[in-house]
Amino acid sequence: MSHQGKIVQCIGAVIDVEFTPGEIPKVYDALVMEGSELTLEVQQQLGDGVVRTIALGSSDGLRRGMMVTNTQKQISVPVGTKTLGRIMDVLGRPIDEMGEIGANSLMPIHRAAPAFDELSASTELLETGIKVIDLVCPFAKGGKIGLFGGAGVGKTVNMMELIRNIAIEHSGYSVFAGVGERTREGNDFYHEMKDSNVLDKVALVYGQMNEPPGNRLRVALTGLTMAEAFRDEGRDVLFFVDNIYRYTLAGTEVSALLGRMPSAVGYQPTLAEEMGRLQERITSSKTGSITSIQAVYVPADDLTDPSPATTFGHLDATVVLSRDIASLGIYPAVDPLDSTSRQLDPLIIGEDHYNTAREVQQTLQRYKELRDIIAILGMDELSPEDKLSVSRARKIQRFLSQPFFVAEVFTGSPGKYVPLKETIKGFKGIVSGEYDDIPEQAFYMVGGIEEVLEKAKSIQ
């Protein structure tokens, strides 16, 4: 049996291939073009021996009558330690011009999620060294975290800082999936990892903005498969995805090309199922854990858009980046009132941390309520208690800013890693009134509270 078919139709990235009736490929089987390295993935069986496929590469130059071979298996990618320090594409082929990967084993990119009885929950905290995150939306080891934000508020910079801090402190293996993002960012990221000497612990999988929708749709699964392989070996892995929205967008493009009727806002009707299929696999089992940090672009800053709204339900912690906070020059521009975490529970993080975080949020919420009154009547019309609340809230707001290691080139000030104990001590002091006599500018862009006191001396 030849397992060969011929192309009968090409519409952009969608290719219809005809096989003899007894040899029709299964859905998700990989087909390879004769005489080229182009791979097609079967998406639908149309009947009469015709299958509809999506091209994982450029379909330029394809024409009817060209021959295609059915590999009779799914797309499989290299896994294991040989992938570390390498940049690969959606098919696991090296794109860093450093020779073959030479991995001992391959794994198919489509797999079932672990069974319910294999899952394990974790309450161990993952310290990030970023004050605002550690205080109001702490991460769990083996949890799923989303970084939500519109265009240009700092998702990728926050992601890079988290990778730098956690990869250095955590010293485990990481997998980074660049899904439909800018090639420049992928290049910056590679060099950032190289300069931080953590490249030999990171596997990089890129499917950039300029690539066909098939590549962008599958590259997240390629990265996830590599992370799952490390987890199944009994390791604790970090899995970074930048950007989940582009994964959804690629699904929308593929869905339209396959002729499905769009649903709300033009998204694919299978949005929730596709998201669930990816997210359910990003989980910790009894053998090892996957801690996942995902950047999620929010179209037009609208958190109710179907794409970010579908992602919310799968996450343990959500870090919401706000344009209003970024416009004040406070970076990281995390909104402490919008960001949430399931770990913010006194039984997990302890009474001291919990009470400090809640008091910080209460103070900021009070300031938010008073802002309209201040804008209309001015500060003088407030009661002494409210004036004190506003003063403390402004100090908290500035103390939530922090210089990043990955942004040293732009800011000119050295990055700071703040341990959790220091963070709690600083904010506890502000809300209890310990630092009421210190000017608010001393709290801006510093690490721990000791730095604030030193800065205050130089100001006074």
UniProtKB/Swiss-Prot annotation:
<dbReference type="GO" id="GO:0046933">
    <property type="term" value="F:proton-transporting ATP synthase activity, rotational mechanism"/>
</dbReference>
<dbReference type="GO" id="GO:0005886">
    <property type="term" value="C:plasma membrane"/>
</dbReference>
<comment type="similarity">
    <text>Belongs to the ATPase alpha/beta chains family.</text>
</comment>
<keyword id="KW-0997">Cell inner membrane</keyword>
<keyword id="KW-0067">ATP-binding</keyword>
<comment type="subunit">
    <text>F-type ATPases have 2 components, CF(1) - the catalytic core - and CF(0) - the membrane proton channel. CF(1) has five subunits: alpha(3), beta(3), gamma(1), delta(1), epsilon(1). CF(0) has three main subunits: a(1), b(2) and c(9-12). The alpha and beta chains form an alternating ring which encloses part of the gamma chain. CF(1) is attached to CF(0) by a central stalk formed by the gamma and epsilon chains, while a peripheral stalk is formed by the delta and b chains.</text>
</comment>
<dbReference type="Pfam" id="PF22919">
    <property type="entry name" value="ATP-synt_VA_C"/>
</dbReference>
<dbReference type="InterPro" id="IPR000194">
    <property type="entry name" value="ATPase_F1/V1/A1_a/bsu_nucl-bd"/>
</dbReference>
<dbReference type="InterPro" id="IPR005722">
    <property type="entry name" value="ATP_synth_F1_bsu"/>
</dbReference>
<keyword id="KW-0813">Transport</keyword>
<keyword id="KW-0139">CF(1)</keyword>
<feature type="binding site">
    <location>
        <begin position="149"/>
        <end position="156"/>
    </location>
    <ligand>
        <name>ATP</name>
    </ligand>
</feature>
<comment type="function">
    <text>Produces ATP from ADP in the presence of a proton gradient across the membrane. The catalytic sites are hosted primarily by the beta subunits.</text>
</comment>
<dbReference type="GO" id="GO:0005524">
    <property type="term" value="F:ATP binding"/>
</dbReference>
<dbReference type="Pfam" id="PF00006">
    <property type="entry name" value="ATP-synt_ab"/>
</dbReference>
<keyword id="KW-0472">Membrane</keyword>
<dbReference type="InterPro" id="IPR020003">
    <property type="entry name" value="ATPase_a/bsu_AS"/>
</dbReference>
<keyword id="KW-1278">Translocase</keyword>
<dbReference type="Pfam" id="PF02874">
    <property type="entry name" value="ATP-synt_ab_N"/>
</dbReference>
<dbReference type="InterPro" id="IPR050053">
    <property type="entry name" value="ATPase_alpha/beta_chains"/>
</dbReference>
<dbReference type="GO" id="GO:0045259">
    <property type="term" value="C:proton-transporting ATP synthase complex"/>
</dbReference>
<dbReference type="GO" id="GO:0016887">
    <property type="term" value="F:ATP hydrolysis activity"/>
</dbReference>
<dbReference type="InterPro" id="IPR055190">
    <property type="entry name" value="ATP-synt_VA_C"/>
</dbReference>
<dbReference type="InterPro" id="IPR036121">
    <property type="entry name" value="ATPase_F1/V1/A1_a/bsu_N_sf"/>
</dbReference>
<dbReference type="InterPro" id="IPR003593">
    <property type="entry name" value="AAA+_ATPase"/>
</dbReference>
<protein>
    <recommendedName>
        <fullName>ATP synthase subunit beta</fullName>
        <ecNumber>7.1.2.2</ecNumber>
    </recommendedName>
</protein>
<keyword id="KW-0406">Ion transport</keyword>
<dbReference type="InterPro" id="IPR027417">
    <property type="entry name" value="P-loop_NTPase"/>
</dbReference>
<keyword id="KW-0375">Hydrogen ion transport</keyword>
<keyword id="KW-1003">Cell membrane</keyword>
<dbReference type="InterPro" id="IPR024034">
    <property type="entry name" value="ATPase_F1/V1_b/a_C"/>
</dbReference>
<dbReference type="InterPro" id="IPR004100">
    <property type="entry name" value="ATPase_F1/V1/A1_a/bsu_N"/>
</dbReference>
<keyword id="KW-0066">ATP synthesis</keyword>
<keyword id="KW-0547">Nucleotide-binding</keyword>
